[in-house]
């Protein structure tokens, strides 16, 4: 993915992070909204420039629609306030928004409801996760992943999904890795997946990742008192590195996913913060993992 996204600071734009198409659309929409409002223009003004309905303009500014390059230039000309460098950056965002997805090679096993998450995860600066059933995807070994998937997927599909998950895990090992803060139920760690050899290798991997400075892993003990109820089970919170973009909540269901936003997202942040306080401290995680290993 190319470094094309922009952030406004002191009236100018500068390139500073790698964006996938989904995040590029979000940043482009936010910047165009900022230009529109700074110039005192209404949605009706944008509607007149693009000859598109107001509802579509609103979707554009939320990052849910894609503009042609000519349309970006037309809006900038109508709004004013974007110099040559700013226009070049916005056009770069528009190109990136139309670029092939990084996961395109796995399109055959990626359902539409999962596409936004794949883009947002790889662009996130902070990932906070609560997992009640299994080890979080980004912390799984390949053998553990295959054991999980082969339980309920055809062999070929399981292999493809395992390969995709392996690519996703690189986010923790790139030069500027994402920060991961995960809370895992002890019961999830005690569930056997793939036999003893697979389980031992998975625990060894978790012990290793506890030493990574950008990974915080906490365990919610079986005997945790007053553990906060979590309606719907596991969920993930994604924070983009751009302050103008909202946090994203991802809740996977049996045959789909939901992305709560606005007021609907607030309870998830309250819940993850309560879980962090209820779970054992991160400093105790390795000793808890060793205790579980001895029980296998």
Pin down the residues of each PLM region.
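A ubiquitous short alpha-helical element
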Residues: 56-61, 256
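Short glycine/serine/threonine/alanine-rich loop segments
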Residues: 41, 52, 215
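Key DNA-contact positions within bacterial/archaeal DNA-binding proteins
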Residues: 44, 54-56
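Alpha-helix initiation/capping motif
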Residues: 22, 53, 68, 111, ...
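C-terminal regulatory/effector modules of DNA-binding transcriptional regulators
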Residues: 195-296
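Interdomain hinge/linker segments and adjacent boundary elements that couple functional modules
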Residues: 2-30, 34, 38, 43-48, ...
